[in-house]
A protein has these predicted regions:
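Conserved alpha/beta core of the MobA/IspD/sugar-nucleotide pyrophosphorylase nucleotidyltransferase superfamily
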Residues: 2-7, 163-237
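N-terminal glycine-rich phosphate-binding loop and ensuing alpha1 helix
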Residues: 2-66
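Structural beta-sheet core signal
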Residues: 15-17, 58-59, 109, 136-137, ...
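Residue-level signal for inorganic ion chemistry
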Residues: 17, 43, 94, 111, ...
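A general structural signal for well-ordered alpha-helical segments in protein cores
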Residues: 66, 88-91, 109, 122, ...
Length: 237
């Protein structure tokens, strides 16, 4: 099922959509990535948008969803399987599908469970990649935050913390090196790229996102609450 991507165009940007989770918390007989929003499967929202701005798309799914997702794709999208319910394994599976070539510029990584991304977000990442080797969206925390201690909990200032989310874009060659050497798995410094960039003094760009469009769908109630928020916003446009 694994294919290798050969690219010819300069400044090639490749997308990896992570969709191999088992949907254990989704509370539906339908797999989360196949659940329909506005008559379109969740995963198709990200595929359709990213296909307009990136040269190639890799979608990482589990074997249970493979056949169903395959029916949704055109020939320009590569579909591969990862049956380990782990984000890092899915990223590695996607990277392993890309043939190492100087013609690849950047890799954009996105969670299929964030289907409400907008064209402006992707354009912003591409523009940011012209200056920074790494760019990523984040969300400000809106709920109270506490830290577990041996005696109970300590309340912490949420303004000192950010919630990292996708989409994120990084120089392909830099990411391949850092991921394989410092993230996966033997010499791991961190599960995230940011601490490693800090360690090596590599500049990056964090972009503030909107909860309405970047909130991750975990269970069925998330879809209902997000759709309701969209309806309210549309009434005031």
């Amino acid at each position: 099922m694994k294919e290798i991507i050969y690219t010819k165009a300069n400044n090639t940007n490749i997308g990896i959509i992570l969709a191999a989770g088992n949907s254990n918390r989704f509370n539906s007989k339908t797999s989360k990535i196949l659940y329909k929003i506005n008559n379109k499967p969740i995963i198709k929202h990200s595929i359709d948008l990213l296909s307009k701005y990136l040269n190639k798309i890799i979608v990482v799914v589990n074997s249970k969803d493979y056949k169903s997702v395959k029916k949704l794709l055109n020939k320009s999208v590569v579909l591969v399987v990862n049956n380990v319910d782990n984000r890092l394994d899915s990223i590695k599976t996607g990277l392993d599908c890309i043939k190492c070539t100087d013609e690849i510029s950047n890799v954009l990584i996105h969670d299929a469970a964030r289907p409400y991304i907008t064209p402006e977000m992707i354009k912003c990442l591409i523009h940011s990649s012209e200056k920074y080797q790494y760019s990523q969206y984040y969300l400000n925390l809106v709920d109270g935050l506490v830290k577990k201690t041996t005696t109970g909990f300590d309340v912490v200032d949420r303004n000192n913390y950010l919630q990292l989310c996708t989409p994120q874009m990084i120089d392909y060659h830099l990411f391949g090196f850092l991921f394989r050497k410092y993230v996966y798995p033997n010499n791991r410094l961190s599960c995230e790229i940011l601490p490693i960039l800090n360690k090596f003094n590599i500049s990056y760009n964090l972009i503030e996102g909107n909860h309405t469009y970047l909130r991750k769908i975990t269970n069925l109630d998330d879809i209902l609450s997000i759709e309701k928020k969209h309806e309210i916003q549309e009434r005031h446009i």
